Amino acid sequence: QAVQPGDQVAVRGPGGHWQTPDDICHLLAVADAVALPAVANTLATLPISARATIVRVNSHHDYPLPLTDRVTVVTAPRDPDGIVATVQGLDLPQNTHAFVHGEAAMVRPMRRHLRLERGLPRDRIHLSAYWFAGRDADGWRAIKQDFNRSMDAESGD
């Protein structure tokens, strides 16, 4: 299909490594504004039988998500402790898969909570720290491997 001048188009970047599991019953997605497009893509691949809880970190950005009656959206404050407290208050069914993407200071305590407090197995958690407050892309890239290793060590992985 050809695009004509004046047509609206959407451009997508490369996809991530996570694919929605076929047997997923419940998805917990925790995301800041930067990660909402990834959450939207994940919701689009969610099986019809699955439910989702989206914890949307409060921001001034309002990215449209494909919401249905199977999706619940909860807003969390921007601070990492507030995000974890919001998730602690959720009743998560068995076979929950977690998709946590956003700023590094949010991702680290969420991993700790999901692995150590909730007992979610590593293979049911997908985390990605997209950015690190106060660092540019090169600065974040320079320390990201060490950051990921320290998160693994913290949660016994």
Residue ranges and their predicted role:
Residues 1-157:
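Extended, composition-driven regions rather than compact fold-specific motifs
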